[in-house]
């Protein structure tokens, strides 16, 4: 060891490098001990990191094109470690043996080859990300994509090796330097290397400008659940009649579908390959992965994170090689030589071989980076409920009902703070442009959360044949009849939304209908709606794909019916696939109801009992330990009463999932709601019988007393039209 330490000197003076390729045997002054230890440490880090990256990426169950290209990056890092290790060996003996010339040549060849390969692959990865993010048509020739990725990697290695071996063919020479073996900068061969590097760097810089904005400077794309888009493809599902709800929303077919920020217009081109997977099945795997649902260990957020991290690593690697390339050209052009700059440039290129393992963290850090890395917005729920639980948030959504069971899609507007009117936006799969106006309303608990629900069990109606129906939302727009009375304002908030749908995806199969994040822990204290343990495992109905879903409201219930009476409430049982939920009887506090009216069929004569669309106003007062944190949710349902045997849906609403689901109660004519509490054994199920005959009597009364009788639903519709006219006038 003494001969090695004596060869490592603390003298900072370094020998002049010979410019003769035959002088590889003549060693320049050796490294100082501190630099030698630093290079050894960085080489060890690069070795461990490259092995870790290779093992992690090769053992992935499903690999994307980006991950496969990064795997080849790890091989380049191993080549860099090997080239530096060879030169470290050359530092040991005082007198160089005869085989040192071939070792130094091998070290220089590997160093230049991995440098060129690393930079070319950085540009290739950025180009692939740019291509997939802006691709509008999925290629049909993707069956050989996995083989193509390997072929591209081998091609890059072959080109890099060819360029690096030109000095062996007589163009350029390899010389020894104090920090390694490299090409002679006095040869025109340096200009060729710089031209290749500059071309790759220029293309990478051009493509990185839009990618940086898409991948790094935009919020994380929302995690769209299958049932949202599955139902949202039409504003009205079969069995949804014209309803009295007031939600002006554009259909996906009526608006231009823009690309989501950070996602591009085609997400399905990021292919996924499983180990041992046939090449012919790779296309299907890639297609399924990008339906915004997880497939194995690969999901869309992870795929997007891989693109983000790959972009960062590509820029990092190319920039770390920039000082070396510039210094080589400067030495060739003006003959400037600075050994400290040489050493710094070499250390930066060695550092470029240590950053690849960061890519493996893309799966764990799928949410990073966001908002240009620094401006990451806090969680919406934590903003909405941090410290001021007594604030009311207004939101409105649209609900469609299909054949007495199924999943429902809601579109809610931004949350609004009543104090400053500043919206707090959800990470919603749609963009909203909303205006909220308020009308006075008597309320003992402050401003209500207003939710508009449209439900029906009637046969499908052709919107083209309906007069006075908003074809966008399939909602009624009746003619005005009388001036609006201010003291009879029935709603506190009206929201007009223009919804711009971001991505249109399709989902198949009932097993995809119940979609939620299992990693989120239920917590009643922060008012995020939870699921009970009994509902973690989907229990499918025999009649369709509906599973008994997540939890809904908790609190007291009041019913407002056209009869002006308080309807009785009772518990009921829900059965599914042999499993039965029988909650205990619970006393429900019911407030005196208030008539919200109905719209009789104008074509029927007053003497007949015509079928009517009856509106039931249901208010749920949420309960929590803090009395100041009361929050009221209003539901307006449109139930078509055609007979006493009509079947109304049983609804469940999840605020976290932002959707309604329902169960068919068989032949029971009732309007039912499931109300879980913080006590698993104290969950409440209520059933509100539909007083069909009372509704019909009320309808006949309206026909017989046309001149002076007007229900609030008519006033409400007139108020809607007035508001709409004012908004259009402004």
UniProtKB/Swiss-Prot annotation:
Its main location: membrane. SUPFAM superfamilies: Family A G protein-coupled receptor-like. Expressed exclusively in brain and testis. It comes from the Eukaryota. GO terms for molecular function: G protein-coupled receptor activity; neuropeptide binding. It is found in: Cell membrane. Glycans are attached at residues 7, 10, 20. Belongs to the G-protein coupled receptor 1 family. Orphan receptor. This is Probable G-protein coupled receptor 149. It comes from Rattus norvegicus (Rat). The gene is Gpr149.
């Amino acid at each position: 060891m003494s001969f090695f330490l004596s060869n490592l000197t603390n003298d900072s003076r370094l020998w002049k490098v010979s410019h003769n390729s035959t002088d590889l045997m003549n060693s320049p002054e050796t490294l100082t001990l501190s630099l030698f230890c630093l290079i050894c440490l960085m080489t060890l880090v690069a070795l461990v990191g490259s092995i870790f990256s290779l093992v992690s990426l090769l053992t992935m169950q499903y690999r994307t094109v980006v991950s496969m290209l990064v795997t080849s990056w790890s091989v380049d890092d191993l080549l860099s470690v090997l080239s530096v290790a060879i030169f470290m060996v050359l530092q040991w003996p005082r007198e160089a043996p005869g085989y040192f010339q071939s070792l130094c040549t091998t070290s220089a060849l590997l160093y230049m080859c991995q440098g060129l390969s690393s930079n070319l692959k950085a540009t290739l990865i950025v180009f692939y990300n740019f291509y997939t993010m802006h691709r509008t048509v999925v290629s049909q020739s993707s069956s050989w994509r996995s083989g193509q990725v390997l072929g591209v990697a081998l091609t890059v290695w072959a080109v890099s090796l060819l360029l690096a071996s030109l000095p062996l063919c007589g163009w350029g020479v390899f010389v020894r330097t104090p920090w390694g073996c490299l090409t002679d900068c006095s040869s025109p061969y340096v200009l060729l290397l710089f031209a290749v590097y500059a071309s790759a760097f220029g293309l990478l810089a051009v493509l990185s400008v839009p990618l940086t904005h898409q991948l790094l400077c935009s919020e994380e794309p929302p995690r769209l659940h299958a049932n949202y888009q599955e139902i949202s493809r039409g504003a009205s599902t079969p069995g949804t009649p014209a309803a009295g709800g007031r939600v002006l929303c554009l259909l996906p077919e009526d608006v231009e579908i823009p690309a989501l920020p950070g996602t591009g217009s085609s997400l399905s081109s990021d292919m996924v390959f499983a180990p041992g997977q046939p090449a012919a099945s790779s296309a299907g795997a890639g297609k399924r992965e990008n339906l915004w649902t997880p497939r194995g260990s690969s999901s869309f957020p992870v795929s997007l994170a891989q693109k983000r991290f790959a972009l960062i690593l590509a820029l990092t690697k190319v920039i770390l090689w920039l000082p070396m390339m510039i210094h080589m050209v400067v030495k060739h052009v003006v003959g400037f030589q600075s050994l400290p700059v040489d050493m710094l440039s070499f250390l930066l290129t060695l550092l470029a071989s240590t950053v690849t393992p960061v890519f493996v963290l893309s799966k764990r850090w799928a949410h990073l980076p966001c908002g240009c890395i620094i401006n990451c917005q806090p969680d919406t729920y934590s903003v909405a409920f941090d410290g001021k639980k007594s604030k009311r948030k207004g939101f409105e959504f649209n609900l469609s009902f299909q054949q007495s069971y199924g999943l429902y899609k809601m579109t809610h507007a931004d949350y609004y703070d009543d104090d400053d009117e500043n919206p707090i936006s959800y990470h919603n799969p749609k963009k909203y442009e909303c205006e909220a106006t308020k009308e006075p309303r008597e309320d003992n608990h402050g401003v209500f959360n207003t939710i508009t629900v449209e439900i029906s069990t009637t046969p499908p109606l052709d919107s083209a044949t309906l007069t006075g129906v908003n074809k966008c939302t399939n909602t009624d727009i009746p003619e005005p009849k009388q001036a609006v009375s201010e003291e009879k304002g029935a709603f506190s908030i009206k929201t007009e939304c223009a919804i711009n749908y971001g991505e249109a995806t399709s989902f198949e199969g009932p097993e995809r209908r119940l979609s939620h994040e299992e990693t989120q822990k239920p917590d009643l204290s922060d008012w995020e709606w939870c699921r009970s343990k009994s509902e973690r495992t989907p229990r499918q109905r025999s009649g369709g794909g509906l599973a008994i879903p997540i939890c809904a409201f908790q609190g007291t219930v009041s019913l407002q019916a056209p009869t002006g009476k308080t309807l009785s409430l009772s518990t009921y049982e829900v059965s599914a696939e042999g499993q039965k939920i029988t909650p205990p009887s619970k006393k429900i506090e019911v407030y005196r109801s208030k008539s919200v009216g109905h719209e009789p069929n104008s074509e029927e004569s007053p003497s007949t009992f015509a079928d009517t669309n009856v509106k039931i106003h249901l208010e749920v007062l949420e309960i929590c330990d803090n009395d100041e944190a009361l929050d009221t949710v209003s539901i307006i349902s449109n139930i078509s009463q055609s007979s006493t045997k009509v079947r109304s849906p049983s609804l469940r609403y999840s605020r976290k999932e932002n959707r309604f689901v329902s169960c068919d109660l068989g032949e029971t004519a009732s309007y039912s709601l499931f109300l879980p509490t913080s006590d698993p054994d104290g969950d409440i199920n209520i059933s509100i019988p539909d007083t069909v005959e009372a509704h019909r009597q009320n309808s006949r009364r309206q026909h017989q007393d046309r001149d002076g009788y007007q229900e609030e639903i008519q006033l409400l519709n007139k108020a809607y039209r007035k508001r709409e006219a004012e908004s259009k006038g402004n």
